[in-house]
Structures are given as structure tokens and as C-alpha cells.
A protein has these predicted regions:
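Helix N-cap at the start of a conserved alpha-helix in ABC-type nucleotide-binding domains
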Residues: 166-168
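Catalytic Walker B motif of ABC-type/P-loop ATPase nucleotide-binding domains
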Residues: 155-158
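ABC ATPase NBD coupling module
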Residues: 70-84, 181
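Conserved ABC ATPase "signature" region
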Residues: 110-126
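H-loop/switch region of ABC-family ATPase nucleotide-binding domains
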Residues: 190-191
Length: 225
């Protein structure tokens, strides 16, 4: 079977922040229906790359293509629905979970919000939970459910389990695999190499703003600790 064409492809991308080069000549491909791990030391440029993928930051050079189309030709709002970013510390708006899920949507149906919660392994009762009373694991899953209400093709997760206990982290790992099984391209930033080996098929290693290796997890992260 021929390899699947990437849903997201980066070519020659360089970025500058505060007069410092944070990404240099980055090239990578993210296939659909796959969990890809983005690894590397702190300060390697991982979060900067995620921000460039959704045009929160504009690169100095290079391009990002979504399903073959340059993202610079897409409306930013449409891009961020198709490529959803969940930050490491997702912000919850005042009010209940329903208000958070519905934010930015045009008259969402209750069934759509419940469906997103259920994919994130949360029941319909969560719609009425105060957002400021969620546990860390619940907050992470609600943030992912909020992204799913936009029906994205690509989900970017910035260290989604960094501050969670083992049980909550396992729930997020199971969710990542479930989403990839439903056809989403999942790109997750993580420092947990054991997690990489559990959930990812492919890995990309960034160091000093450059891609040092990419490919199957065994080849990229197999010998790292």
C-alpha cells in the first residue's frame, strides 16, 4: 500500500521571535489518522512551531500546507477550525462547560456539544458543570471537546498531560488514540518518551529550532530516555 499523503506539510519554515531565530528551515509532514509526537528539549521551538501552524505567529520564511493548500490563503478563523490547537494551560471562560463548548459557534445544537463531550469520555451532565470547578484531567478533556466541536482535521496538543496525575494522563492518551482512529491527525508535544512509545506512530525531534530527526517512533525516540 502506498504511503498516505500528509494532511499537514511544512516546508523550509523559519521564524523569529524577539529578534531571535526560534525555528530554522523546518520541514515535516503530518499524516492523517496518526498520532505524531513532537519531542525535544525545552526551548527547542516546539510551541513556536504549533503557533506557526495555525498562524498565531507568522513565519519569516517557508510555508505550511493543509491538504495541499497554503494556509496563508485561508481565512484565519477557518484555518483554526480545521487545525485546532489546545494549549498546555487551556483557558476556561466564566460560566459552565456548555458556555465554553459553545463559544464562537453559531447557534450550536445541544446534541453537537454532547457528542463532543462523549468523544472526550465525558457525559452530558458535564454541560452544566461550572468550568472553574473542573479537575485538571476534566479541564484537559473539556478543552479537547471544545476543539472537537469545530470538526477539525488536525488536532495540536501542547503537553496535554504535563500537570496531570497518572490516571488522568492515561485517559488523555486513550483519547489521542481514539481520535487518530477516527481519522484525525494528532500532533502532540510531550517530554514523556514513555508516552511517545505508548501512543505515537511517528515522531519529530526538534533541537535548537531545527528538525534533527523524524520518522517512526522506534527510529527517532527508540534509544532516548
Amino acid at each position: 500500500m502506498p504511503p498516505q499523503a500528509p494532511i499537514l506539510a511544512v516546508h523550509g519554515l523559519s521564524a523569529i521571535r524577539a529578534r531571535r531565530v526560534v525555528l530554522e528551515d523546518v520541514a515535516l509532514e503530518i499524516p492523517a489518522a496518526t498520532v505524531t509526537a513532537l519531542i525535544g528539549p525545552s526551548g527547542a521551538g516546539k510551541t513556536s512551531l504549533l503557533r506557526c501552524l495555525v498562524r498565531l505567529d507568522e513565519p519569516a520564511e517557508g510555508s505550511v500546507r493543509l491538504d495541499g493548500a497554503d494556509v496563508r490563503g485561508l481565512d484565519a478563523g477557518l484555518l483554526r477550525r480545521r487545525v485546532a490547537l489546545v494549549a498546555q494551560a487551556p483557558v476556561m471562560l466564566p460560566g459552565d462547560v456548555r458556555a465554553n463548548l459553545a463559544y464562537g459557534l453559531d447557534a450550536p445544537r445541544e446534541a453537537e456539544l454532547v457528542a463532543a463531550l462523549e468523544v472526550a469520555d465525558l457525559d452530558a451532565d458535564f454541560l452544566h458543570r461550572p468550568a472553574d470547578r473542573l479537575s485538571g484531567g476534566e479541564r484537559a478533556r473539556v478543552a479537547i471537546a471544545r476543539a472537537l466541536t469545530r470538526s477539525p482535521e488536525v488536532l495540536l496538543l501542547d503537553e496535554p498531560t504535563a500537570s496531570l496525575d497518572a490516571r488522568a494522563a492515561t485517559a488523555i492518551e486513550v483519547l489521542m488514540l481514539r481520535l487518530a482512529g477516527r481519522g484525525l491527525a494528532v500532533l502532540v508535544v510531550t517530554h514523556d518518551l514513555a508516552q511517545v512509545r505508548r501512543v505515537a506512530t511517528r515522531a519529530v525531534r526538534l533541537e535548537g529550532g531545527r528538525v534533527r530527526a523524524q520518522g517512526l517512533v522506534a527510529a527517532v525516540a527508540g534509544s532516548e530516555r
